[in-house]
Regions:
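ABC ATPase NBD coupling module
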Residues: 1-7, 12-15, 19, 37-40, ...
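Q-loop/switch helix immediately C-terminal to the Walker
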Residues: 21-36
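A short, proline-enriched helix->beta-strand linker immediately N-terminal to the Walker B motif
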Residues: 87-92
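Walker B catalytic motif
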Residues: 98-99
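Helix N-cap at the start of a conserved alpha-helix in ABC-type nucleotide-binding domains
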Residues: 105-107
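Helical segment within the ABC ATPase nucleotide-binding domain
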Residues: 109-121
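H-loop/switch region of ABC-family ATPase nucleotide-binding domains
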Residues: 130-131
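Conserved beta-strand-loop-alpha-helix hinge in the C-terminal portion
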Residues: 150-173
Length: 180
């Protein structure tokens, strides 16, 4: 019941989509996640136009490739599609589990730009797990670090003034205090 309101994107681009299915089939299945549907699969022209318009948001040219298998896409394309699919239906929480870790820098930047766009446009709460301190500072509005299973709030009030070096120094200081 609660899962209907949670979208998630995994670290591995292949985990958020079905590689043997087409882009169109993946999108139709994602949209039908809380609906009852039978064995008949069909998409009418109105839905097809909607899927194309959603894919245009990615700016990857996928709107012209609806009938290709997702397994033939690059990692960055698959991750952008997984992000789109995760946010296609109304959700409240978007869980991002290192969703840029397996991508090259250009694809990671694109996926983060899309993530920021979708979170803002759809007014989502996002929980992003990342080791990329640059992304954490640039896109996060609250930083929470974990150290040996303990949660550490990283300067909540001063977050906007942090840079990567400040965050690394804070983490190193915590490590020293704990005895590492």
């Amino acid at each position: 019941q609660r899962a209907r309101f949670i979208g998630r994107v995994f670290q591995d681009p292949s985990k958020g989509t079905c590689p043997e299915l087409t882009i169109l089939e993946n999108m139709a299945m994602a949209e039908a996640k809380d609906k009852h549907f039978g064995l008949t699969f069909g998409v009418n022209r109105k839905r097809l136009d909607f899927y194309k318009s959603q894919l245009e948001l990615l700016k990857l040219g996928l709107e012209d490739k609806l009938h290709i298998q997702v397994g033939s896409l690059s990692g960055g394309q698959r991750q952008a599609l997984a992000l789109l699919i995760a946010t296609m239906t109304p959700i409240d929480l978007l869980v991002l589990d290192e969703h840029t870790a397996a991508l090259d820098p250009k694809s990671a930047d694109n996926v983060m730009r899309l993530t920021d766009q979708f979170v803002k446009e759809k007014h989502l709460t996002a929980l992003m797990v990342t080791h990329n301190l640059k992304f954490a500072i640039e896109y996060g509005n609250r930083l929470i670090m974990m150290h040996k299973g303990n949660i550490i709030d990283a300067a909540y009030e001063k977050k906007d003034a942090l840079d990567v070096d400040d965050l690394l120094n804070q983490f190193n200081q915590i490590s020293i205090e704990v005895g590492n």
